[in-house]
Amino acid sequence: MEKVLKSLFETIENRKQSPLQGSYTNYLLTKGADKILKKIGEECTEVVIAAKNDNKEEIVKEMVDVLYHCFVLLVAKNISLEEIEKEVRERTGKISKTEERKEIDTL
């Protein structure tokens, strides 16, 4: 899986460096953060709906869309996968106390 995600990220980076006519990725990068963020919000909402409907196939499809749009945002903001990996590694194994986290009470 790591190779597939890295390949997707590299493809998005390549589109930024060498735009391809008609590319959806280039469209998003050209429109900028507001458009990318709107798409992330839409796709996250679709994940929530799929999960509420207990539709595994749709959850998987919509999560792929979320990951793609998040990768586009990272590329747009010049954030590398290595930076994300470093942060994940730093958090791995740390104990997080639930009482220190803000309660989500809007559901």
Swiss-Prot record:
UniProt-listed Enzyme Commission number(s): 3.6.1.31
Reactions this protein catalyses: 1-(5-phospho-beta-D-ribosyl)-ATP + H2O = 1-(5-phospho-beta-D-ribosyl)-5'-AMP + diphosphate + H(+)
GO biological process, any: L-histidine biosynthetic process
One GO cellular component term noted in the UniProt record for this chain: cytoplasm
Signal peptide start-end: none
GO molecular function, one term: ATP binding
InterPro entries named among the record's database cross-references: HisE (IPR008179), PRib-ATP_PPHydrolase-like (IPR021130)
Top-level taxon: Bacteria
Pfam families reported in the protein's UniProt record: PRA-PH
Record protein name field: Phosphoribosyl-ATP pyrophosphatase
